[in-house]
């Protein structure tokens, strides 16, 4: 065993010596090759690839064991015959062609391995080796697979790789020593081995020397020495980010991410499988990171893989990426989403597939948000199955809740699919405003993103490029631009600062909106920093009121920058909480001050100044710090104070003490302060002298001469007042009575009105002075100076009504003060009123308000009580049944409310109260034997008479043939002829229970039917003997109703009340009652009138020549009721019916009453 190991080591050294001496580093295909070992006598290729066996790697792997066994049998070498066998090992391709070059050299120039034939057969000698450099250029990998099945199954095998990375291999003076090689142990499994060689990134371009050493069952195999460059055998990583989408043109775009780690360009191979109506498989090589597949149809599926390799062809193909699946929808939009700006155009294309059938493009319609159909003028046909819609001059998308886009639907003529395309229209007209500071060192630009906030997922940035000098006429976006960092402020604006700046360089800038759908740019704008300067505010601002002139003078100093001519703006106002500003413009660039007129010279003014370029470019500066004026005397007082006097002492004496009183001057009069007051005296004997009283407002002096004139002067730091008031005290003038009367009337507790009359005099009246004081209080006297041309004056003070006041009126002349008019208290009437009721002004309004409230409450209560209790109570004076009754007698009420033994028939309530006009003639008896007939009562309710209009009833047309003995009278009737229809009716009530004879019935029937039969009316058949009963008949007359129309609502529903009353009234053995309706209108419409019978409401024409002119009714005991209530024999009697008209008639005595009913509308 020791000898065997020694022999293997010897072979190692021999191998290294041979390849070093002869420089036999094997230049084979470095990424994939084979290792072959064969006996020396076997030099033909049949050993490596015998006839009948395919020359490929897979065949060699599957049949290597059989090949080796067959080869040994053919050579006749047996284990018993040979104890040692020498093999030649070499590299070759799959056909082993390179091994033949080395088989002839057997004198120490080849690697010989001495093994037993049995071991040779079991281990196998053919290896498939592949080496590559990893894509990250950090690791060199060799992968080995034996061609025999399970070569290391029965032996403990080890594989090592020895390598060296010399910088220069050709100039080595000596062969490389074995110690210079580094060894790595390979990881082996049953079927494969893999060796990892770490290569520094700096040595990827060096030549790598290596060989393999395989040890198994005590036998070692060594491969020839290999030389290769790792950079040329790089195997990239598989591409990542494989994705697919339908392009705007309807093609399928396959794209992936580029490998940023690769230091060299790559080429890609794409293979895809299309499964649609036709299955298609293809593999294409491209240099870009995307591939377009055309003719994409809806409902198709694609399976795609991609791998990469160096573009120059060297290296190894990477592994295939993971397969990616993609399926197109039944309705395809391309593009599915569009992001565009306002005013631009956009187009969508669509392919619609419905139930495995592609819809023709001519059958496709487009909708916007499923609410608005897009006009067909915007449609275009791209192909038989592709429809296109175009939108022009788009407007900004208005967000609707969570939807920030417009949904565009491609629909079939019959239905729409739920899929849609998205249209985002953004207003990119963003205003960028820039401002250069006053020091001209930086420029700040601001802009608002409010118009693009609806675009979710977008980012905005400001991009710009600078021109060396000035701005171009038409700014444009350049592909090469710079990004400016902007910060969002609290006010919602972005702010970007350019520093340093070039004042005369043009900065073209725009806002770029980045989104996953694309990017949009706002219109570019060019800014010249020198044109947007905001200067520093003026400094050293001062303000003062000038002396004597009284003007507000403002001065300032111009800022250092910019050097351009500037204009200035001054604002000023009275100092206070809310300043009312006034402005003044100064356009003189050289001016540093301005004088302004002001109204109040004695007030404090606050002043500020700002500036900007005179040519209008740039911005106004900030306002300067405020400057305030000081209050000081600017002029002499405008006038002296007004003053009055108080006289003390006995008026009979020639000497009296006079106290002068005056009010301090206001600032506007003193301009602006008073240091002291001076009183000047003038008398005839003593001349003129002055008294300085300082700041006091009173002075007492002795009046001893007949005339004494005084003047009060106000003096400030400038001088004494120029205009002053004089007051002359004169004994003769004090007796001049110029005031004739004086009255005082209190208006309220704070106002009293004084009125007076003056008597004519020869003196010149200057003014009047009013004095008043409270006689019960020691507050002192108050006074007012008023003009001389008024005769009443309102005094505003705190007056107590129960106090007593004294009012005095002094006339003041140029010669002196006249005699006053003095009254103690108010006018007498007012005094008594105030004394009786001091709180009159408070009590009276309270009393008036209480009375109004009480009156309103009573009126409301009265109306409610009347509505609840007295609304339905009739007035006896307006009721027909109360006519002629004396309600002063007790028996009237007893008879009125006595219960009758038998029931009577009630008529219906009238629809409205109306006066009655009637014309009735009564005969005392019948001339034939039929006098004894049942009695009846008639109550005629007709229209209200109108004295202005009348009508004559011609009785000849209405005489009855059956009553020849009756003599008719001729009378007049009156009609109101109203425009609206009204209801009139007459009710016949009788308590007779017996049935009249046929003859009696015929008499009445004939009198009625005669008028109806004049024109052969069809109503004649309706009036049979059975249908006409004398017991109770009712005729309803409708006047002034439109021709040929009878209101069914009035005819039926209105009379249902009558029928209800008759039907519900308890009466034994009472026969059926009949109700008949008569239509009455004007004479010129009579031929069109209608009659409504009691049979099924049939409408029949009414006779034009007669209106039931003769109706005879028997009556006896109720004649007094007719006479009293109807005033027989009279005409024009009016009454207002309120209750149903009825009366019960006895059967003991009867009278014949002939009632002439005339047409009231003739």
Swiss-Prot record:
Organism: Rattus norvegicus (Rat)
InterPro entries: FN3_dom, FN3_sf, Hematopoietin_rcpt_Gp130_CS, Hempt_rcpt_S_F1_CS, Ig-like_fold, IgC2-like_lig-bd, LEP-R_IGD
Motif (WSXWS motif): 620-624
Subcellular location: Cell membrane; Basolateral cell membrane
UniProt GO MF annotations: cytokine binding; cytokine receptor activity; leptin receptor activity; peptide hormone binding; protein-hormone receptor activity
Name the UniProt record assigns to this protein: Leptin receptor
Covalent S-S links between cysteines: 37-90, 89-99, 131-142, 186-195, 188-193, 350-410, 411-416, 434-445, 471-526, 486-496
Reported tissue expression: Isoform B is expressed in kidney, liver, lung, ovary, spleen and uterus. Increased level in uterus during gestation. Isoform A and isoform C are predominantly expressed in cerebral microvessels and choroid plexus, with lower levels in cortex, cerebellum and hypothalamus but also liver and lung. Isoform F is expressed at high levels in brain, liver and spleen and less in stomach, kidney, thymus, heart, lung and hypothalamus.
